[in-house]
């Protein structure tokens, strides 16, 4: 393990080839034939019976016996295979579907493939084309199969071929039989063979007419024996067309039918001995093996001696089912087996081979992809702010068990000798010693430790206890993202818990209410180096999801900082020095600034304390500049005042690391903010300085709060009397308004909102009123509370809770919401029996007017519990949903990485993106909103660190020239070439076809230049406003020596210079910072962006609410959001819950025009525009009369005449009404003559049978039921369209339903700007690029609606993965099997055994390139540090590189000399 140079390298598996074992292979690898059903030989003292299922030649399962083949014991012998010979062949359940497919493709008489020669040649040509991937190959094979199924007669022997299928569905005995329905052929006249066959039965049927119904069901039974003989006759050339590679011996179709069955080694099916009795419990496989042997021997005996055909078939069926259960016990219901005792009841299924592989606890997921590891510990965690953020306190008793193998060198020999002497029970000590030339470890618990220490040699390895400074990995499950496992330095402490700094809780999502965490100790120097550099806490302060800080101040730290930096915090010198020593352990040097207050005595402010925390002394390089709003920012009263004059000191300004205004709260110190102090230090001065500041802050706040105290009690939430009074007044007013609305509703006078009925309008209005009253009461409550109220302080500084929580405790709890509505009516039209029926009052529908302080009344308590229950269920369901979703995303994206040519590829080298995210930048390094540099902040920083009063300010044109001087050469490098390698002409530069991989870089330089030009323009505008020359252009040559500002008064010059002086130093520094950050933001090759992208989309899912509806601008036009929506998108669902087409109107200002278009789109039924539909019987005629409501048609702006309605009725295909039967009567009536179906009016003649009255009556009723649902206008798939008024006052049409193409083609709609939220519809109408864009847009929309910030690059990657094969593939087992060809990856995901059987049948090869395969085979994957090889230089000069002499060169030279 610790060797630097080894003589033998371990063998590495390059690839796997799958195939089925042929009968010869099964026998060849077998050590013994299992031929008896007896397991133990009773005469030989219950020894395992020879040739039985437990024969010791196949290995042993108990430690006392030894293997009869290799004479090894249980530890050293892996077991050996046996085999058993079946008396008759049986189908293999794994290849059953494939067997049917082969039979469908060949003639059931001569085994020739059912294709013509030309088809054969064409298909073979397609299959043999180089570079055909798995998806294409399976597509071609499906085409071949479909073509064969259509061929009715064999082209080789002329035999008739019908339909081949399974005899029955389900898990009965018939499910494993194949039948061939020779004569069944749809839509063709029957073959002459059928007539002959039917003719043969005529005489039989004449005597036995009851047999007639059975004759129809007569089919050809393709039993395994018959099928085997057919398969043997298949030509090798035809095998390729069936998807089998016949060049390999095991690639013949007959391989897929069992003739010999392998018996697995005994050690994988051990016998469990019973206590105090000689009996043993046998494994399911052993029991099944004995059953198979017994049944096979019965059949063999029957064949030898003669047996009735019925008995014979029953035995054969039983053998078939038993073998199927042995392989896959799910395929057969054990209760259906012939002779099973409990006729059709429930039987415990056995664990067949498939059951051992599949599922979470199966071999693949349980033992290969993930396993339990050594060198790990687990215990409860607790907080310790005195630790540095990159340390973890490890209990000494854990440190004594976890060891690290350290190699003895001349530098550490003395230390390791001391550790050996201490031994395993004293920390620091050692547990084991591995001598250089010995194989076995020596346990230091025993033996003479002094002697061992004395004889310690260089090169020995000592397994010593964990000690301070060792690198360990720390992890908390569930590991939702990369930062759930980080690397810390160990710190050995007493007591029994792991301790960590609270700043690091967020990435682990840990709290201290009993959480446990895991600790792992890497065992090699290389592993330690990788761990601390790649996974170290300091190097992971930001989340790769969006580049925001994730390790930052939390809870108490924020409260402490807020209290220290408050405006009224002043400290004398003693307190100040005490605070400074608190934050530094008393060993750091501080430069104390001058006090803020001199008289009556020296006082320093809390802001000065914090300034020292950021920059303790003049040796510290940290100079940060920052402007940011606090969490609660009240703007200054006058608009003319700057932000820092905020009424509540709510705007932070830091200049040169001095805090000038604002308090330290969550927005400045917490996580998730890109304008926080720690983020600014990190971006400008690196992670070490940010970590130092965070450590100082943790110590200071924890110790400060320990001294000051901070507690919350019942006093803090006791409302004052006037607050109670105000609350009651506000609630009463709201109740009164609600009562007025309810009265209007009951009278039917309530004005409805667009797209809503009266009840929905009432709910919306009452809901609005009640949420408003809660907000008002909340505001009153917050204003009434004292400034030093503990809950209020926590809510204000953002450490815990919100003002809503405070107002719920003090004033009013508010409306309880269940599934987005008020509490529903439970029984008898009311929510609870305490209220009248159909009551809509606030108190009966879940409004809680009490506060938590005053306590809830019983009905309120129940309503509150209902909504609490909903939240609980939601969380539980969501956990499972998002967990599965994350797993699917991870499996689909795991092997994507950035290569050295900047492309994003899968492990099989399929290109997914040409540059990651279009610009090749790392989301982790994004400073702005998905931009690599925040120009404003960088400019302020550059300006402040280069500011010097003596520097001369540049004129506007000089500013632009300086920028050109630096950016010009960079842009000149990025020239554009066309496809033939020629330079692109200047006028063609902006054409879409010349886009290349450097466009993003060009755009960055361009935006940088624009920013500098903006500064120059601002200066020019200021100069113009003061009567000076703008000078955006350089002056003419003849004027260059003259000062342009000569005539300007000095005071104007000075004022301009002081207001806006930009020196050359500032411009150069700014460009230097911006370009450095851009280069640093480039994505490193080898980054596992697929895995990070999957986690970045999966992890926010756990924080989203599950059942979320959102009103898209209009009430009752619900859009699904949250986890279900993300699930729909990534599953590429064909049917989604709320398909909405957003139609942009040509005339979007006019309400009437919008209504006209709505009428064209929304389906209008006859029932919507008809007064009545009545049946009329008179004068021997019967007809249906429909009266149309022309007024409604006019009001709805429907372009509809009565003739159109008549045409629509005749066109309704289901009604089958002739045009001649529909008559228009007058202006608004339509009459439809009614005749029985199939009866023609014109065929009435005297001889024709009169229609019976019943027929007419039934036809009349049928039409009366169906007529109201006839679509007379609009698109039939579209149930509803709503006119939505956007924020900018324009109107758009929101259309519910499918039919994007039809809506786009509707008059009055701008088709090119019409979109839908249904990805597959976009794909079918607009193509794959549009579908990709649609996926990205929809996921972005969903995430932003939940306030989740996810970098767009992750979402783009997901969109590309779903579409890069040219069709939209969902992230599901079906999509994944089309995206990836790797057998092991698919098998480790879902449907394990199906993929393995498929791989064996189609003889797939797995190149072992992807992540899953490498983990299963224990290899390094080609991602991250595995994506390159380190090659060492040999230092051999070229002169020394001469070819070696050949072995017989001297002899041949001598022979040549002799010949001469």
UniProtKB/Swiss-Prot annotation:
Keyword Nucleotidyltransferase: yes
Record's keyword annotation contains rRNA-binding: no
Location (main, coarse): nucleus
Binding site for Mg(2+): 511, 513, 515
Places the protein is found: Nucleus
A Gene Ontology biological process term: transcription initiation at RNA polymerase III promoter
Reaction equation(s) it catalyzes: RNA(n) + a ribonucleoside 5'-triphosphate = RNA(n+1) + diphosphate
UniProt keyword terms in alphabetical order: DNA-directed RNA polymerase, Magnesium, Metal-binding, Nucleotidyltransferase, Nucleus, Transcription, Transferase, Zinc
Residue positions binding Zn(2+) 1: 67, 70, 77, 80
Example GO molecular function: metal ion binding
Region of interest called Bridging helix, as start-end residue ranges on this chain: 858-870
Consequence when changing residue 518 to Q: Temperature-sensitive
Subunit structure: Component of the RNA polymerase III (Pol III) complex consisting of 17 subunits.
Protein name: DNA-directed RNA polymerase III subunit RPC1
Annotated source species: Saccharomyces cerevisiae (strain ATCC 204508 / S288c)
Origin organism lineage: Eukaryota, Fungi, Dikarya, Ascomycota, Saccharomycotina
Gene (UniProt): RPO31
């Amino acid at each position: 393990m610790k060797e630097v140079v080894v003589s033998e390298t371990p063998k590495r598996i390059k690839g796997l080839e799958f195939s089925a074992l042929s009968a010869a292979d099964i026998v060849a690898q077998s050590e013994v034939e299992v031929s008896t059903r007896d397991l133990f030989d009773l005469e030989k003292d219950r020894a395992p019976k020879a040739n039985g299922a437990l024969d010791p030649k196949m290995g042993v399962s108990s430690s006392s016996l030894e293997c009869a083949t290799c004479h090894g014991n249980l530890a050293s012998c892996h077991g050996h295979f046996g085999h058993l010979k079946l008396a008759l062949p049986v189908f293999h359940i794994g290849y059953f579907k494939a067997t049917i497919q082969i039979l469908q493709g060949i003639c059931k008489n001569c085994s020739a493939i059912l294709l013509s020669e030309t088809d054969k040649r064409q298909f073979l040509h397609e299959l043999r084309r180089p570079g055909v991937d798995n998806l294409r190959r399976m597509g071609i094979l499906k085409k071949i199969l479909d073509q064969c199924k259509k061929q009715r007669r064999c082209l080789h022997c002329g035999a008739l071929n019908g339909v081949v299928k399974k005899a029955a569905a389900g898990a009965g005995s018939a499910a494993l039989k194949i039948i061939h329905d020779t004569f069944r052929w749809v839509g063709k006249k029957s073959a002459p063979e059928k007539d002959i066959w039917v003719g043969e039965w005529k005489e039989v049927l004449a005597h036995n007419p009851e047999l007639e119904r059975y004759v129809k069901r007569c089919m050809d039974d393709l039993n395994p024996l018959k099928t085997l003989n057919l398969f043997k006759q298949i030509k090798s050339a035809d095998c390729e067309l069936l998807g089998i590679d016949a060049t390999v011996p095991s690639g013949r179709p007959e391989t897929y039918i069992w003739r010999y069955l392998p018996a697995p080694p005994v050690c994988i099916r051990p016998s469990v001995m019973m206590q105090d009795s000689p009996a043993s419990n046998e494994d399911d496989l052993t029991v099944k093996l004995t059953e198979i042997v017994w049944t096979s021997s019965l059949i063999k005996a029957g064949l030898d001696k003669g047996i009735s055909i019925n008995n014979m078939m029953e035995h054969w069926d039983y053998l078939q089912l038993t073998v199927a259960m042995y392989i896959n016990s799910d395929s057969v219901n054990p209760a259906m087996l012939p002779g099973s005792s409990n006729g059709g009841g429930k039987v415990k299924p056995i664990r067949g081979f498939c059951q051992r592989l599949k599922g979470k606890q199966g071999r693949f997921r349980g033992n290969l992809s993930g396993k339990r590891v050594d060198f790990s510990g687990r215990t409860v965690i607790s907080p310790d702010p005195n630790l540095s953020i990159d340390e973890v306190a490890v209990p000494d008793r854990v440190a004594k068990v976890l060891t690290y193998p350290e190699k003895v060198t001349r530098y550490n020999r003395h230390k390791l000798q001391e550790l050996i002497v201490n031994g395993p029970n004293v920390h620091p000590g050692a547990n084991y010693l591995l001598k250089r030339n010995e194989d076995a470890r020596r346990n230091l618990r025993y033996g003479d430790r002094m002697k061992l220490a004395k004889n310690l040699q260089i090169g020995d390895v000592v397994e010593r206890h964990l000690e301070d400074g060792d690198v360990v990995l720390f992890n908390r499950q569930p590991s939702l993202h990369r930062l759930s496992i980080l690397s810390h330095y160990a710190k050995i402490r007493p007591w029994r818990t792991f301790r960590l700094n609270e700043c690091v809780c967020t990435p682990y999502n840990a709290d201290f209410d009993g959480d446990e965490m895991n600790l792992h100790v890497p065992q090699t120097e290389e592993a330690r180096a990788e761990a601390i550099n790649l996974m170290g806490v300091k190097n992971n302060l930001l989340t790769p999801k969006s580049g925001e800080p994730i390790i930052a101040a939390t809870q108490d730290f924020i409260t402490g900082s807020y209290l220290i930096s408050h405006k009224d915090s002043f400290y004398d010198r003693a307190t100040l020095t005490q605070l400074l020593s608190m934050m530094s352990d008393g060993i750091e040097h501080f430069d104390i600034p001058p006090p803020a207050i001199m008289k009556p005595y020296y006082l320093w402010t809390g802001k000065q304390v914090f300034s020292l925390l950021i920059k303790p002394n003049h040796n510290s390089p940290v100079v940060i500049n920052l402007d940011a709003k606090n969490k609660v920012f009240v703007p200054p009263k006058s608009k003319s005042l700057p932000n820092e004059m905020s009424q509540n000191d709510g705007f932070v300004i830091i200049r040169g690391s001095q805090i000038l205004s604002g308090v330290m709260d969550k927005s400045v110190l917490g996580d998730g903010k890109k304008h926080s102090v720690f983020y600014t230090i990190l971006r400008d001065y690196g992670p070490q300085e940010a970590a130092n500041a965070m450590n100082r802050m943790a110590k200071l706040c924890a110790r400060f709060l320990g001294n000051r105290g901070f507690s919350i009690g019942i006093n803090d939430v006791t409302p004052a009397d006037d607050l109670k009074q105000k609350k009651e007044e506000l609630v009463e007013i709201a109740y009164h308004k609600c009562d007025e609305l309810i009265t209007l509703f009951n009278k039917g006078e309530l004005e409805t909102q667009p797209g809503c009925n009266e009840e929905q309008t009432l709910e919306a209005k009452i809901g609005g009123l009640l949420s408003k009253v809660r907000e008002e009461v909340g505001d009153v409550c917050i204003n009434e509370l004292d400034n030093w109220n503990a809950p209020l302080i926590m809510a204000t500084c953002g450490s815990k809770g919100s003002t809503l929580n405070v107002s719920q405790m003090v004033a009013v709890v508010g409306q309880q919401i269940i599934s987005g509505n008020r509490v529903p009516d439970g029984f008898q039209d009311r929510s609870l029996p305490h209220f009248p029926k159909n009551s809509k009052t606030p108190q009966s529908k879940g409004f809680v007017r009490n506060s938590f302080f005053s306590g809830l009344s019983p009905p309120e308590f129940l309503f509150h519990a209902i909504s609490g229950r909903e939240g609980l269920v939601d969380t539980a369901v969501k956990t499972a949903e998002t967990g599965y979703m994350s797993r699917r995303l991870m499996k689909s994206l795991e092997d994507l990485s950035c290569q050295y040519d900047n492309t994003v590829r899968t492990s099989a080298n399929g290109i997914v993106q040409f540059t990651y995210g279009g610009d090749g930048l790392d989301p982790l390094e994004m400073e702005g909103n998905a931009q690599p540099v925040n120009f404003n902040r960088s400019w302020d920083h550059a300006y402040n660190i280069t500011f010097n009063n003596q520097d001369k300010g540049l004129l506007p044109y000089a500013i632009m020239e300086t920028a050109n001087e630096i950016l010009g050469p960079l842009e000149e490098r990025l020239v554009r070439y066309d496809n033939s390698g020629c330079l692109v002409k200047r006028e063609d530069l902006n054409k879409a076809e010349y886009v290349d991989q450097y466009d993003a870089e060009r755009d960055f330089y361009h935006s940088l230049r624009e920013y500098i030009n903006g500064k120059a323009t601002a200066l020019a505008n200021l100069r113009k406003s003061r009567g000076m020359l703008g000078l955006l252009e350089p002056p003419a040559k003849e004027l260059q020596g003259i000062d342009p500002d000569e005539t300007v008064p000095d005071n104007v010059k000075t004022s301009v210079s002081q207001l806006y002086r930009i020196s050359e130093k500032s411009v150069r520094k700014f460009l230097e910072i911006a370009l450095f950050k851009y280069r640093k933001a480039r994505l490193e090759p080898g980054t596992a962006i697929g895995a990070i992208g999957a986690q970045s989309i999966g992890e926010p899912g756990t924080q989203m609410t599950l059942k979320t509806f959102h009103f898209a601008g209009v009430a009752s036009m619900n859009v699904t959001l949250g986890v279900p929506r993300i699930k729909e998108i990534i599953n590429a669902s064909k049917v989604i819950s709320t398909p909405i087409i957003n139609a942009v109107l040509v005339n979007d200002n006019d309400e009437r025009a919008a209504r006209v278009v709505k009428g064209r789109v929304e389906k209008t039924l006859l029932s919507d525009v008809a007064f009545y539909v009545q049946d009329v019987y008179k004068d021997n005629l019967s007809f249906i009369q429909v009266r149309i409501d022309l007024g409604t048609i006019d009001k709805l702006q429907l372009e509809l005449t009565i003739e159109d309605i008549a045409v629509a009725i005749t066109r309704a295909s289901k009604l089958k009404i002739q045009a001649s039967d529909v008559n228009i009567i007058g202006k608004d009536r339509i009459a439809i003559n009614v005749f029985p179906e199939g009866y023609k009016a014109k065929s009435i003649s005297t001889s024709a049978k009169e229609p019976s009255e019943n027929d007419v009556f039934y036809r009349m009723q049928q039409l009366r039921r169906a007529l109201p649902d006839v679509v007379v206008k609009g698109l039939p798939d579209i149930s509803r369209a709503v006119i939505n008024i956007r924020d900018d006052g324009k109107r758009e049409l929101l259309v519910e339903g499918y039919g994007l193409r039809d809506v786009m083609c509707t008059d009055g709609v701008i088709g090119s700007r019409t979109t839908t939220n249904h990805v597959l519809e976009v794909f079918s109408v607009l193509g794959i690029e549009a579908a990709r864009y649609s996926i990205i847009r929809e996921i972005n929309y969903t995430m932003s609606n939940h306030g989740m910030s996810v970098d767009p690059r992750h979402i783009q990657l997901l969109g590309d993965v779903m579409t890069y094969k040219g069709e939209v593939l969902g992230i599901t087992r079906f999509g994944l099997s089309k995206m990836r060809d790797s057998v092991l990856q698919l098998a480790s995901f879902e449907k394990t055994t199906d993929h393995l059987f498929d791989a064996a049948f189609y003889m797939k090869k797995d190149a072992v390139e992807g992540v899953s395969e490498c983990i299963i085979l224990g290899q390094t994957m080609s991602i991250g540090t595995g994506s390159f090889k380190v090659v060492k230089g040999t230092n051999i000069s070229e002169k020394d590189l001469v070819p070696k002499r050949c072995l017989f060169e001297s002899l041949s030279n001598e022979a040549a000399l002799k010949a001469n």
